[in-house]
Amino acid sequence: SLRVAQEAEGPRIVVCEVGGVIDLNRRDIRVTNPFLTIAGQTAPEPGITLIRGGISLRTHDVIVRHLRIRPGADGAAPKWGWEVDGLTTSGAHDVIVDQCSFSWATDENLSASGPRFDGGDTAEQWRQHTSRRITFSRNIVSEGLSNASHAKGEHSKGTLIHDNATQVLIVGNLYAHDHERNQLFKGGVHAVSANNLIYNPGNRCMHYALNASEWGAHPWQVGQLSIVGNVVRGGPSTRADLPFLIVEGQGDLDLYALDNPARHADGRAMQETGIISDREPKIRRLNASPHWPAGFRARPSSEVEAWVKAEAGARPWARDAVDRRILQEVRTGTGRIIDDEAEVGGYPVMDEASRPFVEADWDLATMTRKDGAPS
């Protein structure tokens, strides 16, 4: 019924009268019809958890809240070719993904993607034909599987923002135990990353990269990033010389960075930037953000860790065992990057529960309960 509701046409709100685990059986849900709200908060306990698949958004005007998406390797052999995102946008626009939980993807846990050069010959045309106006807020993005079934081998990845994506806001998320792409921004991206908590990144923390071989004869575009009020804490899997931000490849970067404390597990401050390139890309430091969202105020970094721990993830009023464990590992400085969901207990097993949805109890404009209860 979830798949049918998302494939329907016209403005619609998906509410849930049954809570439990939905096995996608390696068939991703592809949303191609716009004006969709998925209100996972309406489900009775234990909420909605998707396993063995993910969601691909290929449309516009979509809101997704309070889902847990845990694809897993599903027993596939290393490099077998089972490559699945938790949730990805592909050429989508006007999308909000808020207070969801993603883990155990074999590709990215959460990403915004699409074609690089569709629509014409100019950068503005390219930007209008890939993902844009995307907000990822207050999610838990954890335990991307490392040496699992992705054909390339190691692929524990948090978030990818693909080339030429614009008006992207990544705010208030918890990244934990992801080897790389604790936000990777590809060439020409315009994005704001604010107030995220990143724990135990492995080989890459934040990362900007324009790969010349992927751009061919197209003129390189300057990336524009605003990185404000993020907190990074190294952990058991973090390499000893990891910098906060790596700039890689050939493209130049306009960077506004402010109030981003980043420390290794032993208390050493991380180097702010590192460059990996055979052509030294230029990092131009800005005194103000070039693309700050209207009305948005970043919190000071001193408030971020407590706020993210309290707010991030699906149904924080009734977290599942996976999210409780992740948060405990963040608190205690423990845990590690994993290769298979079986290393941490495997797919969740939950009793199914049902409860009728009473429309009169809900404000349909905000999808919150009128009595103030969380669900």
Where are these predicted regions, by residue range?
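Sequence termini and other peripheral, non-core segments
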Residues: G10, H150, P374-S375
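Glycine-rich beta-solenoid repeat tracts in large extracellular/virion proteins
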Residues: R27-V31, T49-R58, A76-P78, D85-G91, ...
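Solvent-exposed adhesion/ligand-recognition segments of exported proteins
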Residues: V14-C16
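Acidic glycine-/aspartate-rich tracts in secreted/extracellular proteins
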Residues: V18-V21, T42-E45, G235-T238, A265-G267
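Extracellular beta-strand-rich solenoid/capping regions of secreted or surface-exposed proteins
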Residues: R3-G10, I22-A39, P46-R65, P71-A92
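C-terminal functional modules
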Residues: L258, A265-G267, Q271-S375
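Right-handed parallel beta-helix
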Residues: F35, G40, H60-P71, G91-D107, ...
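Aromatic sugar-binding interfaces of carbohydrate-active proteins
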Residues: A194-E303
